[in-house]
């Protein structure tokens, strides 16, 4: 990968390493999918780390980081990794929040990505999709965007089944980015 893309994956690896208390294996930057070509250099990477430290997510411990998933939608297999999952148990109900870190300079994230992640996590955990929320964190600005409502399985089946290009948005096969 290009040096800038490598720094993008290094940001994701840094977030994972930051939460050392998790019992997950630490992945090396080259083992992680994706990357962000908009991370210019080491100074920019440090600026992203500093910006992350100012977000609400820096003070919360994720339940899972870089959580892999595989999901079949409209007869197509979608594989990927969810950047972070936060779990909330209020005693009566367990809910989850999926967060996708966006390290680029633009706001080009597609809510369908979160819809796929949400469905994958809900089905993996055996919980209703309504108990899973999802957000993009634009790390550079600290802005959190929670698209709502997100389509469920039936709507995703219709959307992805109707795609004439044969590509699946945000799957590894289609080159999902960060």
Segments predicted by a language model, with ranges:
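Non-catalytic protein-protein interaction segments used by genome-maintenance enzymes to assemble
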Residues: 5, 9, 69-124
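Short acidic (Asp/Glu) and glycine-rich catalytic loops that position anionic groups and cofactors
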Residues: 16, 23-32, 94-99, 137-142
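Metal-dependent nuclease catalytic regions and adjoining charged, substrate-binding loops involved
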Residues: 121-178
